[in-house]
Amino acid sequence: MKKVVVGLSGGVDSAVSALLLKKAGYEVEAVFMRNWDSQLNFDFQGNPTLNDVCPQELDYKDALKVSLQLGIKLHRVNFIEEYWQKVFLYFINAFKNNLTPNPDILCNNEIKFKAFINYATSKLKPQYIAMGHYARLIYDKNQKVSLACPLDKNKDQTYFLSQLKTSQLKNILFPLADLTKKEVRKIALENGLINACKKDSTGICFIGERNFFQFLNNYLPAQKGSIKRLDGTFLTYHKGVIHYTIGQRKNLGLGNFSSGQEPFFVVGKNLKTNTLYVEPNSQHPHLYSDRALIIDVTWRGEKTKTQIQAKMRYRQPNQKVTLNWLDANTLEILYPQKIKAVTPGQICAFYDDDICLGAGVIKEVYFQNQKRLYT
């Protein structure tokens, strides 16, 4: 009997993954990860659960109940230090440099598919590691692995896994690859799992829901600055340019608008002058670009294709792009059709139809060879 270790989060997806693997005849053990401590990490402002039981402890209790239901052993491991050093400091430093990072992707790279796998393989000696992600792995005749989209396109999580190296996908199982979320809930209900109706987790990976402005103030105190039109007209003050992203409409403090008048949208940022630029047009030309520089690229497979698709943010429909490799880990992408709100700091994931080829960090954005003032 082959042994598999499942990352058990307390949620329904990982619970059903463990259930399916046990029914398939595997020897199943589970591991719960604790990666955030509000007291140790000075997470006070913007924390709605500060005076309640820690949400991660509630998740652990759910994971423990599921493991007892399934008759599998549950281990608990603490990656609070690793998460702080490898994920959160990067996240904060990116904001400090006026970028818009995606901590969920870095969390997968450094914690779920690195620290967790290292712990599980060294301590528990399984043949496989399983995760409750909605993703698929495809093997060719030489057993080379590719990351691919799952059956449930609405829950597709390949964007969040896009920067994983090929070595991190070795001996990984995704039991939910051929199931929809509705089917997962149905399986959980039919088998009486205690978390069958539990809401999906939201917010920052392993941290949860926060008042984001207040949360960032724990680590990066806001610096008041000017909100201007592109022509330099002063409108009002903002609470810190790092708190806004390209294309943002809400929380600009520019008042209500009469019927037929568009609200203002963020079309540019300048960290050096601490200035936020806005225009009253959701389709303003300054929101669009036709070229971007991508750095820190992870690529799985050959680099022969130049005409592929890209996703610059989660749930964005795939966009046609042309690749131009500049070196082993840097490329530029061209998209003459123009794309809205391509934002520095975000991850650009690359696809060949349903195969996720890799990803990198958006560094700079251009339109007609002129750099956009987004940072």
UniProtKB/Swiss-Prot annotation:
Residues 102-104 are annotated as: Interaction with target base in tRNA. It comes from the Bacteria. Belongs to the MnmA/TRMU family. CDD domains: MnmA_TRMU-like. SUPFAM superfamilies: Adenine nucleotide alpha hydrolases-like. The record marks 133, 346 as: Interaction with tRNA. InterPro entries: MnmA-like, MnmA-like_C, MnmA-like_central, MnmA-like_central_sf, Rossmann-like_a/b/a_fold. GO terms for cellular component: cytoplasm. It is found in: Cytoplasm. ATP binds at residues 7-14, 33, 132. Residues 155-157, 313-314 are annotated as: Interaction with tRNA. Its main location: cytoplasm. It catalyses: S-sulfanyl-L-cysteinyl-[protein] + uridine(34) in tRNA + AH2 + ATP = 2-thiouridine(34) in tRNA + L-cysteinyl-[protein] + A + AMP + diphosphate + H(+). The gene is mnmA. Disulfide bonds join 107-205. NCBIfam families: PRK00143.1, trmU. One of its GO terms (biological process) is tRNA wobble position uridine thiolation. This is tRNA-specific 2-thiouridylase MnmA. GO terms for molecular function: ATP binding; tRNA binding; tRNA-uridine 2-sulfurtransferase activity. Keywords: ATP-binding, Cytoplasm, Disulfide bond, Nucleotide-binding, RNA-binding, Transferase, tRNA processing, tRNA-binding. The active site is at 107 (nucleophile), 205 (cysteine persulfide intermediate). The keyword Translocase does not apply. Catalyzes the 2-thiolation of uridine at the wobble position (U34) of tRNA, leading to the formation of s(2)U34. Its EC number is 2.8.1.13.
